[in-house]
Amino acid sequence: DYEELSQSRPATTTSGLLQGVSAGLYVSQTSGKPGSEGVSMRIRGVGTLNDAAPLVIVDGFEGTINNVNPQDIASISVLKDAASCAIYGNRGANGVILITTKTAKEGRFNIEYTGMVAYQEPEHYFDVISNYADYMEIMNESAWNVGKANVFSQTMIDLWREKEKTPNGIADSGYPNYVAYPNVDWMEAIFTPSVYQKHSISASGSTERIKYLMSVSYMDNPGVIDNSTVTRTSYRFNLSSDVTEWLEVGARIYGYRSDTELADISGSMTLLSRGVPCIYPYYDGKYGWMENPEQSSESRNNLYFFNRYKGSNITHYNNTTAFVNVKLPWNIRYHASFNYSWRDALQKQHPTLGDAYSFSRDEVAYSYNDLSKLYLTYTQTHTGRWEFQTTLDWAGTYGKHDISAMAGFEAYYLNDQSFASTKTGFENNVLEEMDNVLEATSISGSQTDYAAASVFGRVTYSYADKYLAEVNLRYDGSSRFARQSRWGLFPSFSAGWRISQEDFLKGTWVDNLKLRLSWGKLGNNSIGNYDYLSTYASGYSYPF
């Protein structure tokens, strides 16, 4: 029951809701950065050396699981075996996740609000040495254990021992002792608890012929590291109308706008493990530097590293579907739908300015203020995709025999475009735009596309709701493969026996017992758009 699941788990993403709730479905977060789509999903293990992620279908069309607001979902199904996935042909090798979004409830106008406010901080802080005198003594002991000379002099150890007695005293440089002779816990210096919030409101209703649902949500996640905030506004509009008794038309529109700060927090745990206590993170508008000249020159200010780039990534996404359902004679139903989605992203990034300062010596140790070396990069990407589906369905009942059949056609096209430019040499540090940068140093762009077409069909049979059979067949073509290997046939068969429906089990403690046998053939098109056109390149060795 998805509604019960979503209310019982305070997950912020749809993928997070699925963690640990379906046998054989493995969900893990590969990045802790706010706004990151870093999620790994595997159904029954890794199925390929290429992309092993399952296919996600949202209201009948391929989508991205975390593009859907969890509050807009009505149900989620996970298809795992080959017989169930074969109807998706060369996209179903790694399993399929089916998502159906909410529609209006009949008979009344309804407004629903869902909100969440959460306090967030790292679940666990690593124990680090924050007392610098202790750090120096341990480093000396480590060197002695391998027969090497001391790393730090006793004079420096004694100096830090003396200054830590009066942390609020003033050093000769004029700065407080706790700044000039610091003892920094880098876990506490980097991570800052914050408040996460998400609010969703929806309105739905219906008349005799029209059903509608509208929703909007807002999410603000400041993260636990500075300069990593992400905000996101999502929207959805579902509409259907029974024009006549035999004709239904409708549309589904959803999308979002997100704004993500670009903190460089990749490898943050590795950097924190190398942090030394003798660098004060930030004071009086300056980043600290190593206050002990005996300290390794490879030591860095971790706070500056995480803030060394400034910028944002603004993304707009929209997904629109129009559909028509027609009831024809002889229990035949015709369905046609067209889906178009687009995604635009604009990323602007440049290094930050600032001095690395020695507070004990009252001098600039290293300067990051050279405007001539400061660069600005713009990266813009656009993805457009359309998909068309049409099906004919028939179902009939003859005594205890239930038979249904479906045949369909699908066409798909995707186009990716990207453009990037870099200019170097800021005229001033006020305007962070291309007009304020002097020299163009890099311009690049690319465009790729991908097309697919398919015909497919399904026949199901049931006798007395006890003996079941299903046959699927799909014929797929994909531009990602060479011309002679472009098309593939993907059949499947399954048979089932509801043993609990037999007379000899009725009235017993067995409520539901089913035996199922299935076989299927699947394909995988999760490769590059032009991998079959690979060419030779210089600088590589070939075995011929």
What spans do the regions from the language model cover?
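Solvent-exposed loop/turn segments connecting transmembrane beta-strands
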Residues: 224-227, 479-485
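Membrane-embedded beta-strands of outer-membrane beta-barrel proteins
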Residues: 41, 97, 201, 237, ...
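Extended, hydrophobic alpha-helical segments in both membrane/secreted and soluble proteins
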Residues: 73, 235-237, 336, 453-459, ...
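Surface-exposed loop/interface segments of Gram-negative outer-membrane beta-barrel transport/assembly proteins
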Residues: 106-182, 193, 223-230, 234-319, ...
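Short, small/polar-rich motifs associated with maturation and membrane association
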Residues: 1-236, 243, 248-250, 256, ...
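Transmembrane beta-strand segments that form the barrel wall of outer-membrane beta-barrel proteins
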Residues: 216-222, 469-478, 519
